[in-house]
Curated annotation (Swiss-Prot):
InterPro entries named among the record's database cross-references: CB, DNA_brk_join_enz, Integrase-like_cat_sf, Integrase_catalytic, Integrase_recombinase_N, Integrase_SAM-like_N, Tyrosine_recombinase_XerCD
Family: Belongs to the 'phage' integrase family.
Protein name: Tyrosine recombinase Tlet_1492
Main location: cytoplasm
Domain of life, per lineage: Bacteria
GO BP terms, alphabetized: cell division; chromosome segregation; DNA integration; DNA recombination
An example molecular function term from Gene Ontology annotations: DNA binding
Domain Tyr recombinase: 107-280
Single GO cellular component term: cytoplasm
Keywords on record: Cell cycle, Cell division, Chromosome partition, Cytoplasm, DNA integration, DNA recombination, DNA-binding
Task of the protein: Site-specific tyrosine recombinase, which acts by catalyzing the cutting and rejoining of the recombining DNA molecules.
Upper classification of the organism: Bacteria, Thermotogati, Thermotogota, Thermotogae, Thermotogales
Signal peptide region: none
Cellular location(s): Cytoplasm
Length: 286
């Protein structure tokens, strides 16, 4: 069974080209399901749709109740696992086919106001590294993992852009840099004496995501922002501000590296909400 799990992990990483985080989550979900099979004396080859439904019921009834998003991911993990077993002729059919994921209520992402972003960057300017990290998260809409994986060779200054090669789904993308940010990055690289193969933040060892979280938290507290802010909030803010300024949603999709437009569309709700708020203000004033 360990060999099957390892091969499944390799399949997700090298064939499906999923992110490391997603692979770990999927394999963990499958391990949990395999424990259920052992507890109930069920052979993997004998798993039917009925067993899958029983397992989902068990997950739904456990003390620490799963939210719809977590349950949907666990079902997706099993669907991928049995697809893999079909591909490798270990199982003839996929018992998860036809089982619907629970409906997920899309939560409108939190974002910062332009004045809050300005404060955040102003407070971090005394620390060159921190300022550049926050600037890349906001002006380029990077994920934390993408920021941590950036190497000097991923940056171009003529023309000015950053190449993201380790994004979710392993899809390369190009994100332009503002002239001001490009200049500051070039000065930072020169002053630190970095080589092309060095990590931008770090050298031989990349910076840890937890460090990025601490830096974001530090400056939000310093400038008195009361919202619960994390690095991904800056990515949400990047997308929201672009849409508010009338940028085409397809362009925003490409900049974010989303494979599906529906993922980007969630930010439209933020813009729509602003319209409703504006009308409500008129009603209140009237």
């Amino acid at each position: 069974m360990e060999r099957i799990l390892q091969n499944f992990s390799d399949y997700l990483m090298h064939v499906r080209r999923l992110s490391d985080h997603t692979v770990v989550a999927y394999v963990g979900d499958v391990k949990q399901f395999l424990c259920f099979l052992i507890e109930n004396d069920i052979e993997l080859k004998d798993v039917s749709r009925l067993h899958i439904e029983e397992y989902i019921k068990k997950l739904s009834k456990q003390k620490t109740k799963l939210n719809s998003t977590s349950l949907a991911r666990k079902i997706s993990s099993l669907r991928s696992f049995f697809n893999y077993l079909q591909l490798t002729s270990i199982k003839d059919e996929n018992p998860v086919e036809g089982i619907r994921n629970p409906k997920i209520r899309r939560r409108i992402p939190d974002f910062l106001l332009p004045s809050e972003i300005q404060k955040l960057l102003e407070f971090s300017m005394k620390n060159q590294r921190d300022y550049l990290m926050l600037s890349l998260l906001y002006f380029c809409g990077l994920r934390v993992s993408e920021l941590c994986n950036l190497r000097v060779e991923d940056l171009s200054f003529s023309p000015a852009f950053v190449k993201i090669t380790m994004g979710k789904g392993k899809k390369d993308r190009i994100v332009p840099l503002t002239s001001k940010l490009a200049e500051k990055l070039e000065n930072y690289i020169t002053s630190c004496g970095k080589s092309p193969e060095d990590y931008l933040f770090g050298s031989q060892i990349k910076i840890h995501p937890s460090t990025v979280f601490r830096i974001v938290r530090k400056y939000t507290m310093m400038c008195g922002i009361k919202k619960r802010i994390h690095p991904h909030t800056l990515r949400h803010t990047f997308a929201t501000h672009l849409l508010q300024k009338g940028v085409n949603i397809r362009v925003v999709q490409d900049l974010l590296g989303h494979s599906n437009l529906s993922t980007t569309s969630v930010y439209l709700h933020v813009v729509d909400q602003e319209k409703f708020d504006a009308i409500n203000k008129l009603l209140q004033e009237g």
